[in-house]
Amino acid sequence: MKTLLLTLVVVTIICLDLGYTEMCNMCVRPYPFMSSCCPEGQDRCYKSYWVNENGKQEAYHGKYPVILERGCVTACTGPGSGSIYNLYTCCPTNRCGSSSTSG
């Protein structure tokens, strides 16, 4: 019985990954957000926005940027990477960007 209990504890610790796995909000417009573990090696979260021809974030009726997608990346190439109409920005925190006001 003790062996079974010890085995269950070890398996639980391994499966939970002790909290070191990055979680990113995954979303393709319009909603809902789904938090998902990033694959191994992809340890940064990103958000993708629509941008106008001047490279500024395109706002919806002047209220908030239109977020197209969220996910995990291996490395960030810096703020403003992506094409002229699709801006990628990396988030500084785990599960970032769960609302239009958070980073």
UniProtKB/Swiss-Prot annotation:
Signal peptide boundaries: 1-21
GO terms for cellular component: extracellular region
Disulfide bonds listed in the record: C24-C45, C27-C37, C38-C72, C76-C90, C91-C96
Known tissue expression: Expressed by the venom gland.
Superkingdom: Eukaryota
Alphabetical keyword list: Acetylcholine receptor inhibiting toxin, Disulfide bond, Neurotoxin, Postsynaptic neurotoxin, Secreted, Signal, Toxin
Locations listed in the record: Secreted
InterPro entries: Snake_3FTx, Snake_toxin-like_sf
Main location: secreted
GO MF annotation terms: acetylcholine receptor inhibitor activity; toxin activity
Misc remark: Negative results: does not bind to muscarinic acetylcholine receptors M1 and M2 (CHRM1/CHRM2). Is unable to compete with alpha-bungarotoxin for binding to nAchR at concentrations up to 100 uM. Is not toxic to mice at doses up to 3 mg/kg.
Family listed: Belongs to the three-finger toxin family. Ancestral subfamily. Orphan group XVII sub-subfamily.
Entry function: Interacts with high efficiency with both neuronal alpha-7/CHRNA7 and muscle type nicotinic acetylcholine receptors (nAChRs). Tested on human alpha-7/CHRNA7 nAChR (IC(50)=42 nM), T.californica muscle receptor (IC(50)=31 nM), L.stagnalis and A.californica acetylcholine-binding proteins (IC(50)=333 nM and 3.4 uM, respectively).
Record protein name field: Toxin BMLCL
